[in-house]
Amino acid sequence: YGFSQYSMPLSPPLFDGRVMASQPDRGDVVVFRKPREEDVDYIKRLVGLPGDRIQVVDGVLSINGKPVEREKVEDFVAEDGTPVPRFRETLPNGVSYMTLDLSPNSAGDNTREFVVPEGHYFMMGDNRDNSLDSRFDVGYVPFENLVGKAQVIFFSVEGDVSPLEIWKWPTDLRPGRILTWLG
């Protein structure tokens, strides 16, 4: 999406806006700075473009009044053996991905309708019931807060474990996710 002051984290703000800007696509997994808390990086899927009407009804994402195609697939099995319902969602532009439904009546399963303002985007996590995203306090994400498109999971550990806590790696490292390319 080009470069912004957030693209170069260790440099002082050299310019306003974006250089060599391009627009993100619906379905992109995006790294962005959280609005109003710009020292916090988030990574979520872009589901709403400027002008879109976004709503979740009974756990089903709706874009501009049309429910997104959602197909039940094989359950995800949590580490404790608990089966978690998993769905394949397909956005109107054909981008497809898996989502988890940890609880059938979570806070984000029924929302008001959101109308995405110009120059902003609506983001949601794929783990819908465990995601602070645009349905909640993240809100609409301005274009200038986008850092870039996520392309690979470089490193992955469980929960809130810091990658620097190497003594926890034997129990908390998730080797199956390391170097996973994001579609």
Give each language-model segment a name:
Residues 1-183:
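Soluble "head" domains of membrane/secretory-pathway proteins
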